[in-house]
């Protein structure tokens, strides 16, 4: 169990490093081939997204976040259940004038070896999400 725990911790640190650097490639480097991601709460109605979608969406999102900062407030790591939870706040400027200020928790699941992330469920600030993403979608459609 100790070696699996060490592998999970190393994987988690790599994932968080990519997150802090707003670097999707770095984050997804530790994602398994069958990786999935889902935005929570369920009431938002978002489907589970496969890795292939995250590989397109994350770089696009990070590309518009200027002066990005991520502050981690809490990390809980449960080796036995192959999970970690991260509570964080990120902030950034955007080219369309809507400030990015997202308070959220990420629930991360590791594979059996602990060297890959197989799933991330991200509980977002719904008030922010419901205001930001229509503005973001409008920006994307105007800047194709």
Swiss-Prot record:
Species, as recorded: Pestalotiopsis fici (strain W106-1 / CGMCC3.15140)
The keyword Repressor appears for this protein: no
EC code(s) of this entry: 1.-.-.-
Pathway info: Secondary metabolite biosynthesis
Function: Monooxygenase; part of the gene cluster that mediates the biosynthesis of pestheic acid, a diphenyl ether which is a biosynthetic precursor of the unique chloropupukeananes. The biosynthesis initiates from condensation of acetate and malonate units catalyzed by the non-reducing PKS ptaA. As the ptaA protein is TE/CLC domain-deficient, hydrolysis and Claisen cyclization of the polyketide could be catalyzed by ptaB containing a beta-lactamase domain.
Keyword terms: Monooxygenase, Oxidoreductase
Factors inducing expression: The cluster is expressed in rice fermentation medium. Three regulators are located in the cluster (ptaR1, ptaR2 and ptaR3), suggesting that the production of pestheic acid is controlled by a complex regulatory mechanism.
Entry superkingdom: Eukaryota
Gene3D superfamilies per record: 3.10.450.50
Enzyme class: oxidoreductase
Family: Belongs to the avfA family.
One GO MF term attached to the UniProt entry: monooxygenase activity
UniProt keyword Oxidoreductase present: yes
Protein name listed in UniProt: Monooxygenase ptaG
């Amino acid at each position: 169990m100790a070696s699996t725990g060490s592998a999970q911790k190393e994987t988690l640190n790599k994932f968080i490093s990519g997150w802090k650097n707003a670097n999707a490639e770095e984050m997804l480097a530790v994602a398994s081939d069958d990786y999935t991601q889902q935005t929570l709460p369920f009431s938002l109605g978002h489907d589970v997204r496969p890795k292939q979608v995250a590989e397109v969406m994350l770089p696009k999102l990070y590309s518009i976040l200027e002066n990005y900062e991520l502050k981690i407030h809490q990390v809980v790591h449960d080796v036995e259940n192959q999970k970690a939870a991260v509570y964080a706040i990120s902030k950034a400027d955007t080219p369309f004038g809507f400030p990015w200020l997202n308070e959220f928790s990420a629930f991360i699941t590791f594979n059996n070896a602990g060297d890959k992330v197989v799933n991330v469920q991200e509980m977002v600030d719904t008030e922010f999400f419901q205001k930001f993403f229509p503005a973001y979608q409008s920006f994307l459609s105007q800047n194709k």
